[in-house]
Amino acid sequence: MKCVQLKVKEAKKYRFKPTLTENTPKILTIIACNSDSSVKLNAVVNNLRYLNYLNNDIIIINSSGVEFGNELKKKISKFSVVKQILEIPNDCYLDFGKWVHVLNNCDYTSYDYVVFTNDSIIIKSRINCFFNKMIDKNVELFGYNDSTQGRYHYQSYLFGIRKDAIHKFISYVEKNKSLVYSYDTAVLNYELVMTDYFTTKDCFLHIGYIPMHKGMNIFFTNDVLYQILLKTRLLPFIKVKRLV
């Protein structure tokens, strides 16, 4: 598929391993999780290996009182990159509520970018290309991939925001809380509209307007393209929902 070949070629220039200098950007990665199954528990532990990017600190925020919450704490204690583990009750705001809780209660001002992810994916190979391109593009919002399912948007399992635009993220999440009361309304009023609130944006993998993929979800409704992207490491993720 020619369009995929072009994307593979473009991705190669971002697959380098960066070196630490005095100008290396600092990154904070926030992992929102709900460790109510062993699959989700193991997803977080697995993903830490691939999120261990240069000059990157990690904060994990889990749901309180979940079955595998204590086990998660034990397993990640050996990862020095994890600076803090928080717990709050799970609610209808899902990952967005957890991410904003961290931003409101932890000092992120010393970081240049904040990356947001969750336990809905299992990462299968290094994603330096995502971090490298995010830094290179230096836009307010940087997603991993786009989608045209429902409307044009960036899927929210992995994205980054430049420090000076974090206030926009907090503002729109708080503003839309009155519209959110379920999983579907969280997707509708948080994920699908996120690109509307940022002036500059880009993503690592532009696939939303590929003719064979318009209006589809790459993880659930287009296995042909998904398998190609997985094998070429352009999309090195497995969705947990496909395993449980």
Please identify what each model-predicted range represents.
Residues 1-244:
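ER/Golgi luminal nucleotide-sugar-dependent glycosyltransferases, focusing on the catalytic module
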